[in-house]
Curated annotation (Swiss-Prot):
Keywords: Hydrolase
Annotated protein name in UniProt: UPF0173 metal-dependent hydrolase Smar_0891
Listed Pfam families: Lactamase_B_2
Coiled coil: none
Protein family: Belongs to the UPF0173 family.
Single Gene Ontology MF annotation: hydrolase activity
Keyword Protease: no
Superkingdom, natural source: Archaea
InterPro entries the UniProt entry points to: Metallo-B-lactamas, RibonucZ/Hydroxyglut_hydro, UPF0173, UPF0173_UPF0282_UlaG_hydrolase
Keyword Acetylation applies: no
């Protein structure tokens, strides 16, 4: 089982059962100070966070990862250069690169390609899984055909996909991404935070559900989705 809480923009808090059978809480791209965020940075005082995954170092994705890691003792997981930066800032980190499974004993995790930009290392997506659920967070990316390999190799149950356009895929491209990845559930992200990335998630839902068996779950910031 996984409980996915949307924190606005591309930020998520996810609770799942780890490979060791214990409950794990992870954050992905925790820009907690985003304009749509339902939580405050102070809400993470005395919280148990196991891992913080950062897809790239743009401010709306690296976000508040360092502050939260210092407060909670969470390990930051990301491309080598981001993990090195985290260590320089005094927090624990796990460095990896795009390729195979990361050496994390209690979770399945893989850094995937993303078509974007980043100042520290390559931009990535991430596939993260526990005992019974696998989730793909695409990070910031354009559409690319190798998304079909992410679906083939890792079979994510849930795909978290940007739909806002301008900096990432728009609705049309994100629909094609769903067709390539073939997740059971797709959750849109990275839209309506700023004017340039204004998009209609209902249009995304209509197009996906009329062309694929995938179900689209639209989350407002602060809402949660439990799978299965």
């Amino acid at each position: 089982m996984a409980i996915i809480k949307y924190l606005g923009h591309s930020a998520f808090e996810i609770v799942l059962t780890g490979l060791d059978g214990a409950e794990k809480t992870i954050l992905i791209d925790p820009w907690i100070e985003n304009p749509l965020s339902p939580v405050k940075l102070s809400d993470y005082k005395n919280r148990k966070i196991d891992y913080i995954f950062v897809t790239h170092d743009h401010g709306d994705h690296l976000g508040n990862a360092i502050e939260i890691a210092k407060e909670t003792g969470a390990k930051i997981v990301g491309i080598f250069e981001i993990a090195l930066y985290a260590r320089e800032k005094g927090v624990q980190s796990i460095d990896g690169n795009i390729g195979g499974k990361l050496n994390i004993p209690d979770l399945f995790a893989v850094l995937t390609p993303a078509w974007h930009s980043s100042n520290r290392g390559a931009p990535t997506g991430v596939v993260v899984g526990g005992k019974d659920v696998t989730i793909y967070h695409a990070g910031d990316t354009g559409l690319f055909m190798e998304m079909s390999l992410i679906g083939e190799l890792y079979g994510p149950d849930i795909a978290l996909l940007p739909i806002g356009g301008h900096y990432t895929m728009g609705v049309k491209e994100a629909v094609k991404a769903v067709q390539l990845i073939r997740p059971k559930i797709a959750i849109p992200m990275h839209y309506n935070t700023f004017t340039p990335i204004k998009a209609d998630p209902e249009e995304f839902k209509k197009l996906v559900e009329s062309t694929t068996p995938t179900k689209v779950v639209i989350l407002k910031p602060g809402e949660t989705f439990t799978y299965p």
